[in-house]
Amino acid sequence: HCDELYKDPVGKQNFVWGSPKSKNIDYKVEHPVFSSDEEGRPTISYIDQFPEPQNMDQGNFLQRLSDGLEESKNKIITKLPVGFSVIANNYFWLHGRKPFKENKELSRELLRIRGSFFVN
């Protein structure tokens, strides 16, 4: 399904991406959903909560993408035991999570790192 969406020219248009106030980011960015790396391999940059489609074509494209990802037979669903964590490279994995269930006996540390990093 992603192959078909990757070939759709709408996926290579610039999309506007915003953030809710809770993220403390007061600017928007523009980039396509699909592009290619230096070797021509497909890449995806997508977060389902923040797109601001600029027209019906973009809105329909995002809906098809969301439906395709949700219906995918390739997704992995796992439960993390209390005290476990996952570190994921956002440039390699698409990921999501359900809301945290509050546990008064645990503390949660959220670390956001933004910026450019050394690339070998």
Task: Tell where the protein language model's regions lie, with residue ranges.
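Active-site environment of non-heme Fe oxygenases that use a 2-His-1-carboxylate facial triad
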Residues: 1-82, 87-120
